[in-house]
């Protein structure tokens, strides 16, 4: 099946700054070697000339250094990203991939400011993430400094095993993936008739609701995040549409449809009446919630498919959708 976007996941981190000058937060690093490296740069001052002017900082009151650095929504502007990162630190912005993290990348990669490994290490020493991640970054930056590294692809996500950072790096990765996925969808639908495009838009409104509800309620999130599940569904949608556009359309007999529907219903009833009532983070109630939304989703898909692929019978679409839904259940039932 397929699934889509939604994810308003909390961004967390401990960042403390004064309004005029950077006040480095407490380090979580316990590794002796990394602590020694941090001690060697503790008196390093970040370049005063790199900070925004008062007028610039006022204009940057609602800026996002990540958006400016990576070019989300507009052309990348690393110089403005650098000034924004300082502004974020001054206003105690708690976005995890922002402020210090972006500034560390700017000084390491030499994008938006003169390369400055000592400044990058000083920032890395006080990011306040997982101790292992923080120490790993310090070691990595120290190696790059000794190698006179001249690359531009260092990332805070190079070390992101701590849950919060891992989650935010997954969201960051999805932002890049979305650009590529949307481009492919636009290319795929470019030649569609206006009525087909309109039907697809209507379907996607329901699809997005289902993908969000399914990721929250129908997936065991003990070893994953909602955003990762949504990415799985989104990519699956694109793959399915690409196959359909190649002419690889579902073709089920009446008997195959009956079997698929029976299997889907049996799996669902097992979640409601079987001996188990909980599967990790999934409960009977959460399954009911996702099932209710899936039924709306199935109807929305069939309405779209009736317009776009009129040669495929409704029983074939239902069999295809039922088979996919059974697979969703089996992910946690087996």
What name fits each language-model region?
Residues 1-2, 20:
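Detector for intrinsically disordered, low-structure N-terminal pre-sequences
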Residues 2-11:
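Bacterial N-terminal signal peptides that target proteins for export
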Residues 10-11, 16-17, 120:
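A broad, structure-centric signal for solvent-exposed, well-ordered loop/edge residues
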Residues 14-26:
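Hydrophobic h-region of N-terminal signal peptides that target proteins for export
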Residues 24-334:
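N-terminal alpha-helical modules
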């Amino acid at each position: 099946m397929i699934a889509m976007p939604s994810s308003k996941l909390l961004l967390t981190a401990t960042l403390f700054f004064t309004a005029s000058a950077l006040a480095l937060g407490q380090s979580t690093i316990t590794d002796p070697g990394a602590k020694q490296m941090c001690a060697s740069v503790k008196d390093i001052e970040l370049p005063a000339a790199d900070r925004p002017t008062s007028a610039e900082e006022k204009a940057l009151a609602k800026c996002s250094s990540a958006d400016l650095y990576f070019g989300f929504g507009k052309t990348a502007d690393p110089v403005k990203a650098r000034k924004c990162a300082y502004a974020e630190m001054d206003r105690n912005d708690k976005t995890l991939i922002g402020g210090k993290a972006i500034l560390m990348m700017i000084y390491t990669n030499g994008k938006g400011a003169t390369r400055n490994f000592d400044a990058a290490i000083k920032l890395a020493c006080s990011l306040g993430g997982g101790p292992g991640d923080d120490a790993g970054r310090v070691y990595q930056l120290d190696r790059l400094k000794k190698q006179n590294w001249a690359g531009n692809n260092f990332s805070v996500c190079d070390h992101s095993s701590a849950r919060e950072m891992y989650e935010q790096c997954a969201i960051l990765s999805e932002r890049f993936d979305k650009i590529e996925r949307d481009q492919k969808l636009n290319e795929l639908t470019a030649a569609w008739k206006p009525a087909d495009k309109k039907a697809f838009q209507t379907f996607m409104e329901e699809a997005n609701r289902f993908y969000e509800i399914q990721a929250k309620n129908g997936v065991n999130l003990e070893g994953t995040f909602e955003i990762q599940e949504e990415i799985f569904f989104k990519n699956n949608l694109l793959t399915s549409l690409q196959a359909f556009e190649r002419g690889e359309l579902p073709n089920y007999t009446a008997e195959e449809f009956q079997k698929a529907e029976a299997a889907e219903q049996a799996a669902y009833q097992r979640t409601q009446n079987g001996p188990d009532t909980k599967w990790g983070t999934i409960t009977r109630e959460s399954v009911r919630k996702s099932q209710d939304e899936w039924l709306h989703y199935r109807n929305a898909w069939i309405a779209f498919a009736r317009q776009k692929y009129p040669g495929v019978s409704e029983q074939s679409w239902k069999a295809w959708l039922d088979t996919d839904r059974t697979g969703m259940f089996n992910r946690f039932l087996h």
